[in-house]
Regions:
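Extracellular distal adhesion/interaction modules in secreted or cell-surface proteins
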Residues: 1-320
Length: 320
């Protein structure tokens, strides 16, 4: 009799647990059991729960190194694909760690370039620890390059002598790819190479936050290089971060900003952006079809216009 079997099954389950009990997998009981002669070591439930990463927030950053001059304006001197993961505790939804996967996709510069990340709006005290992963050894070895301009600390993975949170990403980008400075990589000219990813894992001091400590709007990726005999490195930041100035070890030269006007030498675009091929200007008004994105120039002049310019490339002039 099926009905009788179900009744006996229910009675059996009631018999093996009290009204506040629970049936759990081996090693996952949420009930505290004191140690004793009959209970052995007892049981202390794990209150932390397991962590799970959220779906990544993904963007691509492209840079032009001729700031504040136009040059070839092809925005492939450094190309970064960035994914941000928030590792949350399943039980509480608290954010424990924030992971940035920074992939170096291209190096189209004719001079040595470094890459850094300043995280605005937070303090070093907000970070318990920084760890690295992925292809981190390739990136970290690039800080040994004679072209490196970062005061890199190989214990904290941040930059020394800067009160802000500045995380060096690459001392010299060509070095990460294993080629000499000036060699074009993944731009349609020069060599085609594997992309490499630097995982930056930031463990938070406050382990009870449910809202992210920082987001894309705080990620100030920049490129830098030696300019003539200047002691400070020359930095190229996204237009949105010009108001923060340079990092402690860098300069952006106010006269350069005045000359630049509304133009930009670094942009954040949707992930997987198909950047211009080498020597192809991102946008031209005289011969639009000879550029990569004819609408870009109008967006750069007024950012309320042509906001989807990146969806309308000249196919033969873009890479990827």
């Amino acid at each position: 009799d099926i009905t009788e079997d179900i009744w006996w099954e229910a009675k059996f389950l009631d018999a093996i647990k009290n009204t506040e009990g629970t049936i759990s997998k081996w090693g996952e009981s949420p009930i505290t059991i004191p140690a004793g002669d009959c209970t052995g070591e007892g049981n202390t439930p794990d209150e932390s729960g397991s962590e799970t990463p959220t779906d990544p927030v993904s963007y691509t950053y492209v840079f032009e190194d001729n700031f504040p001059l136009v040059g070839d304006y092809d925005f492939n001197d450094v190309v970064l694909d960035v994914k941000t993961y928030y590792h949350r505790e399943k039980k509480t939804n608290h954010i424990k760690r924030i992971q940035l996967d920074v992939t170096l996709a291209a190096a189209g510069a004719s001079k040595p370039l470094g890459v850094g990340l300043r995280i605005t709006g937070i303090n070093k005290s907000d970070i318990r620890e920084v760890k690295t992963g992925g292809d981190d050894s390739r990136f970290q070895e690039s800080f040994n390059s004679s072209y490196n301009k970062f005061r890199y600390n190989n214990v904290t993975y941040m930059e020394d002598s800067d009160p802000s949170v500045v995380i060096p990403i690459a001392g010299e980008v060509h070095n990460v790819f294993g080629v000499e400075p000036g060699e074009m990589v993944n731009t349609g000219i020069g060599v085609t190479a594997k992309e490499y990813t630097y995982e930056v894992i930031i463990e938070l001091t406050d382990q009870t936050r449910t809202e992210p400590l920082f987001s894309k709007d705080n990620l100030d990726f920049f490129i830098c290089y030696q300019y003539k005999s200047m002691e400070q490195r020359m930095e190229v930041h996204l237009y949105e971060f010009w108001g923060y100035g340079a990092t402690a070890a860098g300069t952006i030269q106010q006269e350069n900003l005045d000359l630049a006007g509304n133009n930009t030498w670094a942009i954040c675009v949707p992930y997987g952006f198909r950047y211009p091929k080498e020597t192809i200007n991102v946008s031209r008004t005289d011969i639009p079809e000879a550029s990569a994105y004819p609408e870009f120039i109008y967006w750069a002049q007024d950012r309320t216009q042509y906001t989807e310019w990146y969806e309308h490339p000249v196919e033969e002039n873009v890479y990827r």
